[in-house]
Regions:
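Hydrophobic helical membrane-anchoring modules
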Residues: 1-8, 159, 183-248
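Short, conserved active-site loop motifs that form the nucleotide-linked donor/cofactor pocket
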Residues: 8, 37, 63-65
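Donor nucleotide-sugar binding loop of glycosyltransferases
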Residues: 17-20, 46, 75, 104
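Short, well-formed alpha-helical segments that are part of the catalytic scaffolds
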Residues: 17-30
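Short beta-strand/loop segment that forms part of the nucleotide-sugar
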Residues: 36-46, 67-69
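A conserved acidic beta->alpha catalytic loop
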Residues: 43-53, 101
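Acceptor/aglycone-binding surface of glycosyltransferases and processive sugar-polymer synthases
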Residues: 71-88, 93, 105-189, 216-226, ...
Length: 248
């Protein structure tokens, strides 16, 4: 893969991920890794939680830069820290990976392509482009049904047509990170969906691309019922104008 001189940064929020993060880093394709400018690991656990990185890992992957939160601030907050630093570094593209390996690093070349060529501003890696693939990948049936129902409701409410709003495999151009006022979005698991919503409403070009689904024995910190009700809250807030951001 040729990144055409683009400065690409990978952002990885990490919380109690010492056992899984090394495997995620090892799965980044070699040709992509060689062309990465920086890998930003955001330690979101604070001092009381074991760190996901150690001296051995940092020596093996010298492109890693570790960013620390003094206490657990949340999934969205960790991304904000990463993207803020990516912009400071002059990144042209920021790609998000999960430290637990749920989203395949092997897909990075294909997902990066629309951003490298300039045909998209934001890339959504969607598990729901193929319902059969989602189920084969181990997505629990209750999550599968909830994803479909919530996504259809969101598309209806927002006047958009995306295959899902609940994937954590997101990639952004520098333009996307400057057009969307991401600092004003949620610090929680809703950050990704809000980025997608606000980006689309601001006219960003979104590539909705299929990715494989993987559910293994990784620990999830998302509470499904609470999350579902909070999605309804996001829809309510949208209709109240929370995501209009006039003049930005």
């Amino acid at each position: 893969m040729n990144v055409s001189g683009k400065k690409i940064v990978v952002v990885i929020p990490a919380y109690k991920a010492a056992l899984t993060l090394p495997g995620v880093l090892a799965r980044i394709p070699a040709d992509v890794h060689e062309q990465l400018f920086k890998i930003l690991v955001v330690e979101d656990g604070g001092e009381k939680v074991p760190r996901s990185t150690d001296a051995e890992l940092l020596a093996k992957y010298p492109k890693i830069e570790v960013l620390f939160h003094e206490h657990n601030r949340g999934y969205g907050a960790a991304q904000k820290t990463g993207y803020r630093r990516a912009l400071e570094l002059g990144a042209d593209i920021a790609a998000m990976l999960h430290a637990d390996g749920q989203y395949a690093p092997e897909e990075l070349p294909r997902l990066l392509e629309p951003l490298v060529t300039g045909s998209a501003d934001l890339v959504l890696g969607s598990r729901m482009r193929s319902w059969r693939s989602a189920l084969r990948g181990g997505m629990p049936k209750y999550k599968f049904v909830a994803n479909i129902c919530l996504t259809q409701l969101e598309n209806l409410a927002y006047g958009l047509r995306f295959s899902e709003y609940h994937s954590g495999y997101m990639l952004y151009s520098r333009r996307a990170l400057t057009v969307v006022p991401f600092e004003k979005l949620s610090d929680t698991f809703h950050f990704d969906g809000e980025m997608l919503l606000v980006g689309a409403k601001k006219g960003l070009r979104v590539a909705d691309l299929p990715i494989p689904t993987h559910y293994g024995d990784e620990e999830s910190h998302l509470k499904p019922i609470k999350y579902g009700f909070e999605v309804l809250g996001v829809i309510r807030d949208y209709w109240r104008g929370k995501y209009d951001f006039p003049g930005e």
